[in-house]
Amino acid sequence: MLWSWYMSNDTQFYALAIIILLVSVKYFRVAAGAVIFFLVSSWATTIMVSLHYGYRARIQDPFAMFDELYDKPWTRLGPYLVGMFAGWFLLRSKNKIKMSLSTTVIGWFLSLATLFCLVYGLHLTTLEAWGSALYVSVGHTAWGAALAWIVIACCTGYGGCINSALSFRMLQPLSRLTYCAYLVHPVIMVATSFQMDGPMHIHNALTLILYFGN
């Protein structure tokens, strides 16, 4: 199954999260230390794997070394830990925190800038070995941190128009179907590919059809 790597990672992270959260009830510092340890270990492991295989981050080949770097749990743990912290923070603060205007503006700027740089930062850029290692090790965690800010800001009253858009009631049915679509659509895509009698010739119209259809 095309999505089995994700389900495997999610299951392992869920089991690890239960243990950490149970420990945090009585030994919070131990749990916090474990989170920091796992986060730093994930970064270090990803850097070592990237340097070992001579990985070069390129926007033209985003899934290079998929089996070595992309789908392994020890390289994907960072954003899950960030999400755990965001959830714990919202629970402890009861969605009630006070931020100054400058803090809010800086937070939104850094969040959106991080998302933009992670998506488009490799355009017309060639990273060397160490640059690629740092990018692939911290990139997923930085993406999770940027999204965590959006969640925290929206839940605490600092989301503005973005919170209004994300909370739009008409989108709620679609949001409940996203995981189902993730599980079903690869099967449809593979079945469609098996029905083809020749290669596809990519052009703008076909790209739009495939994008909105999948």
Outline where the language-model segments fall:
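Aromatic-enriched alpha-helical transmembrane segments of multi-pass intramembrane proteins
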Residues: 1-5, 19-144
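Transmembrane alpha-helical segments and their boundary/interface "anchor" motifs
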Residues: 6-15, 34-38, 176-184, 211-214
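Alpha-helical transmembrane segments of multi-pass integral membrane proteins
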Residues: 76, 80, 84-86, 106-214
